[in-house]
């Protein structure tokens, strides 16, 4: 079977009110960008027609403006975990418009696997390449892994993949994809030296669970640090004085 190539708008049309979506990435690195932006546009259209449309978003860490920012501004987020740094999103949370859980990032995949955050409907993943081997598909992640293997395995409605040409296919091989056991059966992670590998360089799924592939070329939404002001400069001086 070949993979079904669709547009970001066609992918967004698959997402329904109340769905829970899990995203790849960790900070803005490796986060899907074209589909979340289209989901925000869909939400605006639904709201203009008087229809309810809000989704739950699970990620590995923070995301960029095309996800947290646009979706928050479109009033499209019902629940969000575990972490964000987006100013627009923060404003909507503080206005009591979004339910937000600031979980410890290292516990996020475990919380999902053990059912504390409900069922995952869709996984939306950014990849540099997708290969098919028999009935299996190999998803090669881009700049970050995050909760990708967990949400890909648990997404009950399917997996949507953004193949982002901004990231070179030389990314293939940089990841060591591995899921630890759930409590109380967790065993030691057998990494004894920096060169040890315990998983696979890709996320493996049943090929028929991939409902569409979107081709795009979008850079990661990296943020620059703000220039220091008088207050942050004084904080730095205080810390330096304390240490010295």
Which residue ranges define each predicted feature?
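Conserved alpha/beta enzyme-core scaffold
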Residues: 1-244
């Amino acid at each position: 079977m070949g993979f079904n190539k669709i547009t970001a708008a066609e992918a967004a049309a698959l997402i329904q009110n109340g769905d829970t979506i899990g995203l790849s990435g960790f900070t803005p690195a490796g986060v899907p960008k074209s589909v979340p932006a289209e989901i925000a546009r869909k939400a605006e259209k639904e709201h203009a027609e008087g229809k309810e449309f809000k989704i739950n978003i699970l990620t590995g860490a923070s995301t960029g403006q095309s996800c947290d920012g646009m979706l928050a501004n479109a009033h499209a987020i019902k629940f969000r975990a575990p972490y964000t740094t987006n100013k627009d999103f923060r404003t909507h949370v503080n206005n009591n418009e979004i339910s937000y859980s600031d979980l410890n990032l290292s516990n996020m995949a475990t919380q999902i696997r053990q059912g504390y955050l409900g069922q995952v409907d869709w996984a939306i993943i950014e990849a540099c390449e997708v290969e098919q081997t028999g009935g299996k598909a190999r998803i090669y992640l881009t700049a970050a892994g995050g909760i990708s293997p967990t949400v890909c395995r648990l997404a009950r409605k399917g997996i949507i993949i953004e193949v982002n040409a901004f990231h070179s296919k030389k990314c293939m091989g940089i990841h060591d994809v591995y899921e630890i056991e759930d409590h109380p059966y967790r065993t030691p992670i057998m990494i004894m030296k920096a060169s040890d590998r315990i998983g696979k360089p890709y996320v493996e799924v049943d090929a028929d669970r991939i409902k569409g592939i979107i081709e795009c070329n979008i850079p990661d939404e990296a943020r620059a640090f703000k220039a220091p002001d008088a207050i942050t400069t004084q904080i730095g001086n205080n810390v330096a004085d304390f240490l010295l």
